């Protein structure tokens, strides 16, 4: 990392006294009170800068997070209003610190003025500028429609996948298919590679996710138009020689066995090589890749396999095989160069053509909002000043998931004067598939006016906090990337009920690492996951038994299943743990992406509703009673006689007398 890009030292943030100007980056590790501090910054900006609720821009990346921030900030304002009216902080450290600092004797704001500003903000809080990134961009563009160069009436779409694919199909038809018709070998290569309009669409989607990235085509040479003909000529020569000399080659190799390496060129391997060459020539494709087994009969492979002091078997075919391998590689490189040339042309023209089609059809996607605002800010410098006057201060939440385009927008509007606060934790970056880029976070930190960390973990116990500090600080490059560092945190002062486990035979410890039993064989990933799930379920079952006996508890309260969380890396692993827990008779709730309508509970509810809808249908009744909710076994269901069901002629609804 260059000296210019090296991040400055981070200071521990005291949110109630830090300067409210410039560009500030705050690294907020998990559990350190990120939202609490955002609320404090918001209140200080509102009071000390005399800003309205609609003037402080707060941006986060999901609608759920936006709603949470909205309610948390409103709640803080209401608490503060009550404290100013009554003179009582209610024991809340948030309010107490504000009364000591911003509203204290050393502060420049008297309580009466502060109360007016708080009440003004609460009255107008429905207009608070707390948005997702896309909602902010849309509002900004609506305030400057001519600069945005967007249609006044348009169809907002979540994405432009259908239009992208339409464009890709057109390019495939007009550019790729004519080239494939001219070069049959290229057509075969496209089929073998799985190329098609979908591949073009995927390339364009990646390009649109990072519109500021510079495309570099270094090392992409011009296609060698003679490569296919050279490969065909070499193939014909080799095939002809093989037809004439196969038996002689076989005999030669048998004779040469004593001088050949018996790991790579043992008799069975040479038999496979002979068969592979015969099959390859029978296929008749001059540019097809040589089978791996066939490569054992190239001169290069035979020289390598010859024992020290031995004489390498000699035959013209071995040299021709070497030449054919090189010719096939050259033909492959030519096809690849043709495809890359097409991709380069495609990515050069497609973004502009896609934008033109969208304008014609009055369609705008969410990603277009960002691109259009960025373009408008670059084209019209006055727009940045207009937006800065509209939003004199900004707080960006989850900044680690910001992509280069998003940061460029905020940087253009708010830097260098600010106040702009960028709050996030690079260790929790999860949206790389949406083009979020950790290097954006690191670059922003290098150029920030000030960098802070939140150093008090309010969520975990002191033992867990200490263990995490020792675990991650034992390696100065625990997160690999330069600049992605671990800052030690300390536990908060909140008193928690201690966890007591009187049934644990092992050494006490809040942070433990389990290892699967070792063995001589290879442990497959599938088997390792199954063993881990079983071990996890067994431990939970042990804790639940201890809870029933009063030995496993939180303070004086027996431990309950709801006190236990199992963290996994994938949804599939979560489903595995849930199934294994069920075999132990332990119920669990899985937080997954699947629709609630695809769950087992939904299927059972559907069966019950179907039985209610048709009370005379014995089959539906049996299906409903077989649900887990009723617990009837097969014997009980079979004993249900047709007479047990309601008569089929009963009306579905009984009229209510008027």
Describe each region flagged by the PLM.
Residues 1-71, 75, 83, 152-158, ...:
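Conserved motor-region signature of P-loop NTPase helicases/translocases
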Residues 2-3, 29, 55, 196-364, ...:
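Conserved ATP-driven helicase/translocase motor core recognized via long
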Residues 9, 108-115, 342-345, 373-381, ...:
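Short, motif-level signal for alpha-helix interfacial/capping segments enriched in acidic residues
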Residues 16-26, 60, 77-283, 515, ...:
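Conserved ATP-dependent motor core of P-loop NTPases, especially the RecA-like helicase ATPase domain
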Residues 38-41, 106-113, 137-142, 321-324, ...:
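Active-site-adjacent bridging/hinge elements
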Residues 60, 64, 124-127, 151, ...:
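Generic amphipathic alpha-helical segments used as scaffolds and interaction surfaces in large
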Residues 125-138, 188-214, 343-350, 364-369, ...:
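Core structural elements
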Residues 130-137, 164, 168, 343-392, ...:
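Conserved helicase/translocase P-loop NTPase motor core
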